[in-house]
UniProtKB/Swiss-Prot annotation:
Binds 1 [4Fe-4S] cluster per subunit. It comes from the Archaea. Keywords: 4Fe-4S, Amino-acid biosynthesis, Branched-chain amino acid biosynthesis, Iron, Iron-sulfur, Leucine biosynthesis, Lyase, Metal-binding. One of its GO terms (molecular function) is 4 iron, 4 sulfur cluster binding. [4Fe-4S] cluster binds at residues 293, 353, 356. This is 3-isopropylmalate dehydratase large subunit. The keyword Magnesium does not apply. It is an enzyme of class 4 (lyase). HAMAP family: LeuC_type2. It comes from Picrophilus torridus (strain ATCC 700027 / DSM 9790 / JCM 10055 / NBRC 100828 / KAW 2/3). Its EC number is 4.2.1.33. Gene3D superfamilies: Aconitase, domain 3 (3.30.499.10). Belongs to the aconitase/IPM isomerase family. LeuC type 2 subfamily. GO terms for biological process: L-leucine biosynthetic process.
């Protein structure tokens, strides 16, 4: 009896793969960005392979648009490579944050095996595929071979049941899962999510949860495909295969979560597993940030805009909203969400990873405090080492921007 992940590795390797086995598996796609791509390209060139262009996806996103000469050099290097070898390529204004683009453009689909040279490649498990973060050198090898060795991961089954309370979303659920198991608590395992609560969550919320399995050290994430999954991919691809766990599949452990008990939550410095109900936190803030591969989708921006409509942010707070892709940006324009946000005093930017990694466009100065929808709040993550980052869902971030301190949306409405 096998888990879905064991079945996928079996099919992709041609072996009877079980957790703990080492296999060489064929990948459907390998993805790099402007930061990880240059090293992958160097490795590929050194090996002298012929590229498997139809399986290579190049998506500049971390320092986009380039913030300085060095980042411009990196951008040019990955673009030149993509154009030379006719790979999939999403340039400025046509793509966005790599993980969002991989989902939007149909690269992620049930049953696929994908490697990405970025730690949050786990995100695509929301669509019932196996997606893993790898190193740049490994990506360069895959450019020419289409294969990679894997240790088949054990599966932690996270059973989440109960109807979430109003204002509780995927971000709050995954923060509470992290609080339960700790950072690194699922190291090199697959975190599979099941239970009645998943039925209430749209693909956006599942993506948020899958994204932050990285913070638990997980090798990958997995959600079973359902009608919401198929609706999401319907106009993107028809090439997929649905895998499910056998009834008597073996799990490394089973963790039960009652979603009905979860409150809107915030992760306080300096760890994503350091979680409190938002009602217990009230620190003053300097910046509020809505965006990233974790919570920069149109659903997130809509929810923030509902809180901000006809209101003004605190005079001492800067609010930044950064959509996860050009598609999200365009949709926000069409729906009038950009006007709502800027009328409230917020700044609506083009798509980039930027501030999430302390790169640019929202970097924090000494002693500053930010509440953010991103995925990490380690020391110095978004700027100066003395700055502080709190993690929360978009509604909480929007409400906090208005109040000038960490606040619940209930205080606004």
């Amino acid at each position: 009896m096998k888990t879905a992940v064991e079945k996928i590795f079996s099919d992709k390797s041609g072996n009877d793969a079980r957790a703990g086995d080492y296999v060489i598996a064929n990948l459907d796609y390998v993805m790099v960005n402007d930061i990880t791509g240059p090293i992958a390209i160097d490795a590929f060139n050194e090996l002298g392979y012929k590229p498997l262009s139809d399986r290579i996806v190049v998506i500049p996103d971390h320092f986009v648009p380039p913030k300085d000469i060095n980042s411009a050099i990196q951008y040019k290097k990955v673009k030149d490579f993509a154009l030379k070898h006719n790979t999939h390529f999403y340039d400025l204004g046509r793509g966005g944050v790599c993980h969002q683009v991989m989902m939007e453009k149909g690269f992620a689909a049930p049953g696929r095996l994908i490697a990405g040279a970025d730690s949050h490649t786990n995100t695509y498990g929301a669509l019932s595929c196996v997606s893993v973060g790898i190193g740049s050198t490994e990506a360069g090898v895959i450019f020419g071979t289409g294969r990679m060795w894997f240790k088949v991961p054990e599966t932690d089954l996270i059973r989440i049941n109960g109807r979430p309370k109003k204002g509780v979303y995927g971000k709050d659920i995954i923060l509470n899962v992290l609080s339960r198991i700790g950072n690194g608590g699922s190291a090199y395992k697959c975190m599979e999510f099941t239970g009645s609560t998943i039925d209430y969550l749209d693909i956006n919320e599942r993506m948020t949860m899958a994204n932050m399995t990285t913070e638990a050290g997980a090798k990958c994430s997995f959600f079973n495909a359902d009608e919401k999954t198929l609706d999401y991919i319907r106009n993107k691809t028809n090439d997929y295969k649905i895998y499910k766990d056998d009834e008597n599949a073996e799990y490394s452990r089973i963790i039960d979560i009652d979603a009905s008990e979860i409150e809107p939550s915030v992760a306080i410095p300096n760890s994503p597993d350091n979680v409190r109900p938002v009602s217990k936190v009230s620190e003053r803030i300097d910046q509020a940030y809505i965006g990233s591969c974790t919570n920069g989708r149109i659903e997130d921006i809509r929810r923030a805009a509902l809180i901000l409509k006809d209101k003004k942010i605190d005079k001492n707070v800067r609010l930044m909203v950064v959509p996860a892709s050009q598609e999200v940006y365009n949709q926000a324009l069409k729906e009038g969400l950009v006007d709502i946000i800027t009328d409230a005093g917020g700044y609506f930017a083009g798509t980039t990873c930027g501030a999430c990694l302390g790169g640019y466009m929202g970097v924090l100065g000494p002693g500053e405090t930010c509440i953010s929808t991103t995925n990490r709040n380690f020391i110095g993550r978004m700027g100066d080492r003395t700055s502080r980052v709190y993690l929360a869902n978009p509604e909480v971030v929007a409400a906090s921007a208005i109040m000038g301190r960490i606040a619940s949306p209930e205080e606004i409405q």
